[in-house]
């Protein structure tokens, strides 16, 4: 009983208010720490001053490796860091890593399922040096075409935006690279819901109807055969406007007046030179030199590559692109699709009229020179 009474008294002490005596300070707790001291320096255990902070190149490479992370937020933040690094440095300085090292990590993100990742990817692509990107158009185009035919409508919209950026800085390279003309046109028709009538050995009502509807010289293009999906329901036609705008830019780069590599550009520039007779008897000396404005001037010969079909061929001149554009029925399909879009009116109708103007000017220039007579 004595021990039990003692324990009860000890417990009651916790709830009893101590009586303070006048003139005496309050008792300090057991865990009290005196902080009234003053010191000029604080010494930490295991402190090392030999380690240096990571350089900008190291941080850039680290965030570049994080682009393959499974976390959406990690990929988004890494893209934002890379974009900030590229935009903050002076324009005359090269990026911390070459574009040939940066692009392989960026290309798979064109097909990323996260919208914020794709948006940050487009910002990063626009921050890359334009003259360096032109040499890697052949690597970019397969991923862009894969995104344009993706099942998700949002990925298709983002891929077309990437194509619009690439056409704006390297339009000649986009339409002149292997598969850059025919395959990209097929992707555009797929995105917009315009289809070229396929040639079949079997007679059918649909085939005969589409064939009879096509005009001479315009191929066997058929009209729109299905409602295309342009992303979210609240977009109100804005993706379609962007698609048609980028299609107009793509056609202008390929067959429009801004198209490069006409057949006689090299000869004309050489003949107009004031020093054309300095290398007599060779008056067109520049035409005998290796082109210096191309990274791979003989890539079109495909000397060591696999054989290409008509879709994967390189069409370097404006005339060659116009021939295949008419022969494969793209002209008829695009004209009918633009006519349908023009009937919708509004912004869609205005943009479709611009694309139709590009076709009309190309027809007047090229068919007037006799490039469409033999088809």
UniProtKB/Swiss-Prot annotation:
InterPro entries in alphabetical order: ARM-like, ARM-type_fold, Ipi1_N
Keyword set includes Nucleus: yes
Keywords, ordered alphabetically: Nucleus, Ribosome biogenesis, rRNA processing
GO biological process: rRNA processing
A single GO cellular-component term on record: rixosome complex
Subcellular location: Nucleus
Chief location: nucleus
Bias kind Basic residues: ranges: 1-10
Pfam families (alphabetical): Ipi1_N
Residue span of region Disordered: 1-35, 208-234
UniProt-listed PANTHER family: REGULATOR OF MICROTUBULE DYNAMICS PROTEIN, TESTIS-EXPRESSED PROTEIN 10
Protein family (similarity comment): Belongs to the IPI1/TEX10 family.
Function: Component of the RIX1 complex required for processing of ITS2 sequences from 35S pre-rRNA.
Quaternary assembly: Component of the RIX1 complex, composed of ipi1, rix1/ipi2 and ipi3 in a 1:2:2 stoichiometry. The complex interacts (via rix1) with mdn1 (via its hexameric AAA ATPase ring) and the pre-60S ribosome particles.
Name of the protein: Pre-rRNA-processing protein ipi1
Organism: Emericella nidulans (strain FGSC A4 / ATCC 38163 / CBS 112.46 / NRRL 194 / M139) (Aspergillus nidulans)
Native organism taxonomy: Eukaryota, Fungi, Dikarya, Ascomycota, Pezizomycotina
């Amino acid at each position: 009983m004595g021990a039990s009474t003692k324990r009860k008294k000890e417990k009651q002490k916790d709830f009893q208010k101590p009586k303070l005596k006048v003139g005496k300070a309050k008792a300090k707790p057991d865990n009290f720490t005196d902080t009234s001291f003053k010191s000029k320096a604080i010494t930490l255990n295991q402190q090392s001053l030999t380690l240096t902070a990571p350089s900008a190149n190291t941080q850039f490479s680290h965030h570049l490796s994080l682009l393959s992370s499974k976390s959406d937020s990690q990929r988004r933040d890494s893209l934002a860091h890379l974009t900030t690094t590229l935009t903050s440095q002076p324009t005359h300085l090269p990026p911390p890593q070459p574009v040939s090292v940066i692009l392989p990590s960026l290309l798979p993100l064109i097909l990323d399922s996260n919208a914020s990742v794709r948006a940050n990817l487009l910002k990063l692509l626009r921050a890359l040096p334009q003259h360096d990107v032109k040499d890697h158009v052949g690597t970019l185009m397969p991923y862009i075409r894969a995104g344009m035919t993706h099942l998700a409508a949002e990925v298709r919209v983002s891929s077309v935006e990437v194509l619009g950026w690439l056409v704006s800085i390297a339009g000649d390279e986009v339409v002149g690279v292997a598969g850059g003309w025919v395959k990209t046109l097929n992707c555009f028709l797929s995105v917009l819901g315009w289809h070229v009538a396929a040639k079949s050995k079997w007679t059918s009502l649909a085939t005969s109807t589409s064939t009879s509807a096509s005009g001479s010289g315009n191929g066997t293009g058929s009209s729109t055969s299905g409602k295309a999906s342009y992303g979210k329901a609240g977009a109100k036609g804005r993706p379609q406007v962007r698609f048609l705008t980028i299609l107009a830019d793509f056609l202008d780069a390929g067959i429009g007046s801004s198209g490069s590599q006409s057949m006689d550009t090299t000869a004309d520039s050489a003949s107009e030179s004031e020093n054309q007779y300095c290398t007599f008897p060779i008056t067109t000396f520049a035409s005998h030199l290796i082109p210096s404005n191309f990274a791979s001037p003989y890539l079109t010969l495909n000397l060591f590559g696999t054989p290409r079909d008509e879709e994967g061929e390189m069409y370097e001149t404006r005339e060659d692109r116009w021939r295949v554009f008419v022969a494969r029925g793209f002209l008829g399909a695009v004209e009918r699709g633009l006519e349908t879009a023009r009937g919708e009116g509004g912004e869609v109708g205005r943009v479709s009229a611009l694309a139709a103007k590009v076709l009309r000017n190309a027809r007047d220039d090229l068919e007037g020179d006799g490039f469409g007579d033999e088809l």
